[in-house]
Amino acid sequence: NKPTLVNNVETISSVPWIIQNSGKEYSKLGVEGSTGTRIFSLSGHVNNPGNFEIEMGQSFGEFIDTFGKGIKNNKNVKAYIPGGASAPWFTGDQLDIKMTIDDVANAGSMLGSGAVVVMDEDTNLVYAAKSIVSFFAHESCGQCTPCREGTTWLEMILERIASGRGRLSDISLLLSLIHISEPTRLLR
């Protein structure tokens, strides 16, 4: 029952600029609903991976072209993760989505940690999904059944598909597991 202030490095890194220029000026950066700047980590099949502080509001395509210097070997984007491993993925034809909280949410994902992972046209998306699910299965704290059991099942199904033993029913089973776990998990 005591006052608490919780900030992350990203918030604290904005303080010197705000002190020097004012909060009013900072709020002019970005776009309505997503003002200021944000640090995004860009990785995957880009020519220039790294961490970049940008004004909110540009499209993911602009971000990848400007800061990532495009895709390696001039390939096309097959998919990208807009906000870290737990964020729903976007396809390569969704590069025009603006990097704002509302635009990304309205498109069905989240900015989350700001970790943008780009996958080119040669990426096996089943293997990519399995890699992420394996991480979550391994890192699960085990407190809630949907996460503890669900990620293990997702991992097994994706492994079956990746090894060529997948069944058509695996798709509906994957979707069912995802929809069941979403409202019942503890971690939000």
What does each model-identified segment do?
Residues N1-M56, G68:
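Hydrophobic alpha-helical positions that pack around
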Residues W17, F52, D65-T66, W89-D96, ...:
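Short acidic, glycine/serine/threonine-rich loops at helix termini
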Residues G57-K72:
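Short amphipathic, charge-patterned alpha-helical segments
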Residues G70, M99-A129:
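Ubiquitin system architectures
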Residues K72-I101:
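Terminal amphipathic helices with adjacent charged low-complexity linkers/tails
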Residues P82, A137-M156, S181:
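Local cysteine-cluster metal-coordination motifs and their immediate loop/turn environment
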Residues T145-L168, S172-L173:
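Iron-sulfur (Fe-S) cluster-binding segments and ferredoxin-like electron-carrier domains
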Residues I178-R188:
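Single conserved hydrophobic/aromatic residue that forms the stacking wall/gate
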